[in-house]
Design a protein with these regions (language model features):
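Conserved SAM-binding loop of SAM-dependent methyltransferases across substrates and taxa
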Residues: 82-95
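Short loop/edge segments at beta-strand edges and connector loops
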Residues: 21, 47, 126-128
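N-terminal auxiliary segments of SAM/dcSAM-dependent transferases
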Residues: 1-43
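Conserved alpha-helix/loop element of class I SAM-dependent methyltransferases that forms part
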Residues: 33-36, 54-71
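Conserved class I S-adenosyl-L-methionine
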Residues: 71-81
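Short, well-ordered secondary-structure micro-motifs
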Residues: 56, 87, 134-137
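Class I SAM-dependent methyltransferase Rossmann-like catalytic core
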Residues: 41-53
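S-adenosylmethionine
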Residues: 95-99, 103-154
């Protein structure tokens, strides 16, 4: 589905990022499953292989170049949607203890299937951030909070 490995590797290199064949294969599975699942559940408007590579995968992983996340850190992605940016980050940093939070059950079902396909270990929570953040199990328990357009709750 994705453009060929050498092309993808070259794009990652342009941003100072390394891409292994194993990582590429996982991203390719991700892209294919995303587009397939998107036909029944609206997850993203971006479905062209080159755009998925650039706007979903490189944009997600680029954070690792600018933010030093210590080994074995815990990270929650609030309002994760289709898993961006945290699932691609987990492909590159499998040591991160990942929690994915989304308010829509159809997206959490997608994420469960996706993580299983990729071998990504993640706790997936179906819930609203405003409610989950009140739960002692999750409140102030993460080293990194990843979110888009959300108020600070954790």
């Amino acid at each position: 589905m994705l453009p060929e490995f050498e092309y993808a590797k070259g794009l990652f290199n342009e941003y100072g990022l390394e891409l292994s064949e194993e990582q590429y294969e996982k991203l390719d599975i991700y892209a294919e499953f995303l587009v397939e699942y998107n036909e029944k559940v609206n997850l993203t408007a971006i479905t062209e292989p080159d755009e998925i590579l650039k706007k979903h995968f490189i944009d997600s992983v680029l954070m690792l170049k600018f933010v030093d996340i210590p080994r074995d850190s815990s990270m929650i992605d609030v309002g994760t949607g289709a898993g961006f940016p945290s699932v691609p980050i987990a492909v590159f940093r499998p040591d991160i203890k990942l929690t994915l939070l989304d308010s829509l059950n159809k997206r959490t079902i997608f994420l469960e299937k996706l993580c299983e396909k990729l071998g990504v270990k993640a706790e997936i929570i179906h819930g609203r951030a405003e409610e989950v953040s009140k739960n002692e199990k999750y409140r102030e328990q993460f080293d990194v909070v990843q979110e888009r357009s959300r108020i600070w709750l954790f």
